[in-house]
C-alpha cells in the first residue's frame, strides 16, 4: 500500500484534484493517448496552477504542442474558460470546496494520503465539470445522434430480423478512436454489423438506468456482443464465455420506453448504430454483493457525496454532520499511478525526464459512473481489417459475384430490392466505385441474409477481407436458394389453381408453402398431444407398435382427407384408454361392511359375498375380476347395491343397460371405417372411469335381444363375461386386445328364465328376495322417510309418520315385494304434508281484521308488501330460491306446527285403500285353494278355483275346462292334477263317483295376468279333491309344489319369495316339497316367524293335513243322494 504525506491546505488539494480531472477530460475529448497524457501530469505540475493561468501552464502548453489538428485549439480554450469560471465560483463559499476548506480548519495540516489497494483510477466518478466538458465537446455529435435516430428507426422496422438498418440518413460521426471502459450489452440470435442499424429491447432496470445517464452525459457508446446461447434472455454478461469475444462498438442513437406485451413489464427500446469491430479485452461482470452492501458502503463513498453536494448547494444545510474524511477524498481523486509517480518525483528530480515513457497501470475511465448501476463493463480492443490489395482479382471476383447474387435476389424478392437500393445510394454518396468498399459490401450481405448464428458471427470475426467476402457469399447463396424455392412454390401453386376461386387459391398456396417449408399446420400439436398422453400410460408392445404406425400415417396425410379424421379419432380413443392404470384396492373388511350397511338394509347374502371377495383379495394380494348376477324382483335394490359395492371396494362405477339391445356393435363396437363408428360400451366404460379395474354394472341382462340382422348381443357378452377370454377382449373399433380380467362385472336381472344358458353359466347368481313387512318397516324408517322429508323440505320439522301408518301403507297400498312403490307413496305423503304446513303458516302469519285496526296501518302494510313484492321480482332466480329456502328454515323451527301421519288419517294423503283385505277369500268355499307363485315382481298368492258347471248328471264323457290365461306348463299341470285327483279319489273313496258325473271348470283369478310355472300341481289337485269331497280348505293354508302322476311332490324354486307372499297374505300354514326343507331352514327368522311349515314328500301328506277329519264313510257318502237319483233315472231310461 502506497502512503504519501503532504502538507497543504484543503483548498490546494481540491484545486489539484480538480485540475487533474480536468486534463483527463480534455485528453478524452481530443481522442489522444490517455496513458501518455496522464503520465505527464502529476501533483507537482498542477499544485500551483491558478484559474487565470491554466492555459499558460507549461504542462498545458506541452500538451497543445502535441496536437496536430488546429481545430481543437479554439474548443479547448472555451473549455478552459468554463472550468476557470466554475473554479472561481467554488471559492465564493457556496460550493463543496468552500465547505471542505472550512472543515479542514478543524483538522491537522499534515494529512496522510492513504489510498486503498483495491481503489484504482477506474473508481473515480466524473464531476459536474466533466459533464460540462462532455456536453460541449459532443454537442455536434449529439445533433447527429438525434437526427439519425428517426432514420434508423424507420430502417430497422423495415427488416428488424436481419438488422441491416440501411437508411438514407447519415450515420453518427465523431466516434472516439480509443474509448475507455464501456457498458457491455449481450445481443441474442443475430450479431450486429458496422454501418447497419439495429433495434434492441432491454428489460433489466439497471441497464435501462445506465443507458439513460449515458444519454444524459452524451456518452452513448456500448459494446454489443452476441450470446452463444440464443435461448438465453439477459441484459448483462456474467461470464466472458457466455458471449462471443468479437462484437461491435455501437452508438445509442435513440431510446424510448416500451412495455412487454406478454409480461406487462416496463422495457426500453434502444436503436443502435454499430461503428466498428471490437474485441473483449477484459470483462467486469456485475457484482451482486455490491448491491447488498451498497447501504453499508454509503458512508465511505465520499466521492458521491462531494459531487452531490457540489451540484446541490442547498442540500448542504441538511447534510449529516458526519463529513467524509480528507483521506477518502484524496484516495478517490488521485489514481495510484499518479501517486506512484509523485513519489518518484519527490525522491529525485533527475528522473523527471523519464516520465514520458511511463505506462500507466490502469485505464483512465470517464465512464466510471456506470459502476454505480452494477452492470457488465468491458475493456475492449479495436479490430482493424487486415490490409488488402484493392486490385486483387480474387476480391474483385468475389465482389462481382456478390453483386450478381444481389441482382438475382432483387428480382425474386422485392424487400431485398429496396434494401439494395438504399445501400447503393449510401455507397454512391461516399465513393463512386463499390469495388473500393468490399468490406462494407460483405457486412451488408451478412446483415440482410437469414443465415445461421455461427455463420454470421464468423463473418463478423473475419478481419481478412477475402475470407469475409467468401463467407458472406455463402450465406447470400443460401438466401438466393430460399428465394428461388419460394418462387418455385408460388409458381407451382399458381399452376394448380388457375381455374379456381381466389379464396381456394390462397388456401392452396398457404398449404403448399407450409408443406415445402415444414411449417406446423396443426398436426404436430395433435401428435404431441397424443404422445404426451401415452407418457403416463403403460402400453403393451403390440399396442405401442400400432400407435407408432398410426402416428406415422397421421403425419403424412393432409388434414382435408377423410382418412385423416378416421385416424385422428382412432388415436384419440386409443390414447384415452387407461393402459396400466388401476385404482387402489380397499381391503378393509370393517370399512366395507360399514358402507354396505349404511346404504342397504338386509341383503345378508350379497354383503357376505362382497366381504368374501375382499378377504380373498387380501390373502392373495390381488383381486381378479368376477362376474356376479343379482336376480330379484324390481325395487329390492339391485342397481343401488352395485354402487355401494364400488364404494366399498374403492373402485370407479359405470352402468349401462342392455335391455332391448339388438345390435352386437353396442358391445363390441363398430368397424372404424364406418361413418360415426364408436367403440363398444365396455371400452367407453374404461375411458370414462380411467382405470382398468372398475365395477361395470350390466343392467337388465335378462331383457337383452336374441339374434337378428345385427347379430346376437347375448353371444357378444360371452367374450366379455368369460374369465378365460376377457383378458384379451377384442373390440371391433380398436381391433386390439384389451385386458378385462381385473374388471368386476355385476349383472342384474328379474328372472333367470330368459337369460341364455351359456351366459348364465359364466355368472355367479345371487338371488335377492322380496322384503317382508318387518323389513319394509325398517327400510321405511331408516331410509325412505328421512329421504322423503329431506326432498320435501321438512327435514327438521315436526312432521312425522307413525309406525302403524307405515304398516297400514304396506298392507293396503303397497303389497309388492320391493320398496319402490312404497317409496313413491311416502314421498307423496310428505309432499301433501308440506302443503298443509305452508297453509297453516300462512293462516298464522296473515293479519286478522279487527275493529281496532287503523286504516293507515293497513295501507302501510299493503304498501310494504307491494314494495317487497317488487324488490323480490327484481332479484334473480337464485336469490328467489335462497329466499324460499330461508322461509322453509323458519318453518322448521316453528314449534307450533306439528303434523302426524297415522293410520287414521292415512287416506287423506294417499286416498282410499287399494287392497281391502289380506286375502281374496276370508272363507273359502269348496274347490278354492290358496296357492303360491313366483313372478318377476316377487312372490304372490295364486288362488285356484274349481266349480261344477252343472249338477251331476249321467254322461259318457265328463268335461274339464280351464281358464285364467294359463301357460302351457300350467295347462299340463292342470290336466295332470285332474287325472291324479280322479285316481286318488277312486282309491281313497271308491263309492264316490264324483268325477264320473261332474263337468268341472278350473279358473285362476286375474285372467289378464299370464300365469305359468311348474309349481301349482298340488294346489290344483287339492282344489279338485275339495270339490269332490265338498270340503272347504282352511283359508290360512297356502301351498306350492309340483305333482307327478303318482302323487310325488317335486322340488320348486323361489321358496323365500313364496313364503314372504304367504305371510303377506295372512297365511299361517305353508305347504312345500320336502326337497325344499333346506331352503326353508336357511330363511331368516323374521320370514319364518308366524308360519307353520309342512314339508310334503307325497301328496298323501298334504291330504292328511287338510282332510284329516274326513273318514272313509263320510267321503263315500258325500254325493250319495245325487248318485241314487242318477242311478234310478238311468234304470228308468
Curated annotation (Swiss-Prot):
Residues 1-37 form a transit peptide. Optimum pH is 7.9. Residues 98-176, 282-358, 844-889 are annotated as: Disordered. The keyword DNA-binding applies. Residues 182-480 form the Lon N-terminal domain. GO terms for biological process: cellular response to oxidative stress; chaperone-mediated protein complex assembly; mitochondrial DNA metabolic process; mitochondrial protein quality control; mitochondrial respiratory chain complex assembly; mitochondrion organization; oxidation-dependent protein catabolic process; protein folding. ATP binds at residues 632-639. Residues 348-358 have a biased composition (Acidic residues). Belongs to the peptidase S16 family. NCBIfam families: lon (TIGR00763). This is Lon protease homolog, mitochondrial. The gene is PIM1.
